[in-house]
Structures are given as structure tokens and as C-alpha cells.
């Protein structure tokens, strides 16, 4: 089994840090500090070496230290392809971010070829009651760990969709070009939908197989394209292209694309109670989310033979003793690089004693 882990992390002008350098190994790491000391900022910096905008989904301008026009994060990382140097540079004025692998520029969506990460933050605990987009992006990040090409597919689809919206905004359409773009969207949609359905099956099996102190979840995708594939319907590509053609006038008025895999929703039920997670208590929602994260991590290791970096922000807060003790024992037993933040070691003394301690 390959372990993805950081050997070192260097941040400059990042959030509240002018300069910070950390040396680490393939072991659990506990970051202790008061609220506002920068614990989550460190996790966010690490998460930038995975497709997307990091665990906060923050605007680039908000990441740079106040009064600084640029910031950077560098890492020496044991990747899927061996030891490598990664860096990301952010410029506030141009609102641009560049990423490098061994001093060569790469696209953000290519990072899943090299790294694998799973994270859980307090902000994610509201995912079941937030918008469809948040849940879909959460699930697509899970798919990245099972299929590294998925990030590139999602990025391509979004590019084609933006092109379509631009064409529709014009007074005169180039029908041939519009038809080509819609066909590309349809083709890419099938790959995205199939990847989601395949991962959904993997994840459900992982949840059902994993015995722990957290509630079982029942997962599903609510999307027209995914449903047609599940039903075994023929020529789904043709159906998507026809729907996009049919909604042109409507989408021109809306200024956006109203149909497609970018509208699918990721639904989660409390299996035992047979109710959607959004109707559960906040405590149950957090427990269900932890169960999903544990299943994702376990099955990613089983399927890809690669152990991801695990980033857990204040994961022990508001857990009862039974679940906190289970997580403590579980995290001590697994062989991967795990980053945990806490204001102090109260209740997790055993975990703190067996991890590298970073005090801010």
C-alpha cells in the first residue's frame, strides 16, 4: 500500500502566518492552539494540493495575508508517483493561482493524479441542509479519490457549459459551434454520471461493511442523467444533447444552463430511521458525516491501495465519550498521515501522546 504524506510544509504570507515551516512524517499529527491561532489555516494550506479551492472553498484574495499582494505554499510530499515537490502561488491583484509539480506548471485538476486527501471541517456539518451545489461538490471530491480523472472531466464540463452560456448570451448564435459544444457536454456528462454511480456503489458497500459507533447511511444520486443510466435507457448522450437544444431559449433568458449533471444532488438517509439526513438532529448529522468519511477512507485504501492524507478540523468537538473513544482508538490504529486540530488535549490525551504535537 502506498501512503500519501507530507515531509514538510512551508507557507509564506498565508492567512495569519508571515512564515511557517513544519517537518512531519507518516504519523498522526495534532495541532493545538486557541481559536484564531491558525490551526485550520494549516489544514487549508495542505488541502490546496488537491483539486478544487481547498477545504474552505475560499476566494483567492482572502487567502493572502492582509496587506500582502501574494502568498505561497510549498510541500515536499510522498505522492502516488514518489517523492516530489509541490508549490502553489497566489497573487491577490490578478486573482490568479498557479500550481507546480517538480517546478513544472500543472492544472489544478491534475493534482488528483499525484495526491489523495479526505477532510472534515465544522463547516461541512451543515452540508445536508445547505444547497444542492455543496452536496454535489462534496460527493465529486469523494469520486476524485476513486478516479483521479474525474476532476479533469468536471473541469471540462464546466468549461463547455460556460462556452455555451457565452454563445447563448450573443444576439446571433453560431448554431454549428453551439451544437458541437452541446455534444461535448453530453459526451462528458456520461463519464461524470457513470463515475458518480460507480463510486456511489463502492461507498454504499463500504458503509454497509464497516462496523463502528456511527449510524449507517443510505446514499443516492438525484439526477435525471444518472437515473436514465440506472434504468438502462439507450442513447442517453442523444437525450442530453436534445435537452440542451430544447432549453436554449429558456437558458438565454436565465443566463445559465438549467439542465445537466451540474444539477444532480447527493442525498443521504439515516438508514435505521429511514429519514433524510437533513431532518436529523445536528449531532446525528455530524455522526453520519463522520461515518461517510470513514467509509470513504477505508474503501479508497481497499480499492486503490493508496492511503490518503486525512485532515480533521475539530472532529472531536461535541462527540459523546463512546464515539470520541472509538475515533481515538481507530485513528491510533490506522497507518496514514492524519492531521487533527483541537484547542487542547482534554479527552484525547492518548491520541495526543501517540502523535506529533504542534503547538501554536
Curated annotation (Swiss-Prot):
Signal peptide: none annotated. SUPFAM superfamilies: P-loop containing nucleoside triphosphate hydrolases. One of its GO terms (biological process) is DNA replication. ATP binds at residues 33-40. Coiled coil: none annotated. It is found in: Cytoplasm. The keyword Glycoprotein does not apply. InterPro entries: DNA-binding_RecF, DNA-binding_RecF_CS, P-loop_NTPase, RecF/RecN/SMC_N, RecF_2. The keyword DNA-binding applies. GO terms for molecular function: ATP binding; single-stranded DNA binding. Its main location: cytoplasm. GO terms for cellular component: cytoplasm. Keywords: ATP-binding, Cytoplasm, DNA damage, DNA repair, DNA replication, DNA-binding, Nucleotide-binding, SOS response. HAMAP family: RecF. Belongs to the RecF family. The RecF protein is involved in DNA metabolism; it is required for DNA replication and normal SOS inducibility. RecF binds preferentially to single-stranded, linear DNA. It also seems to bind ATP. This is DNA replication and repair protein RecF.
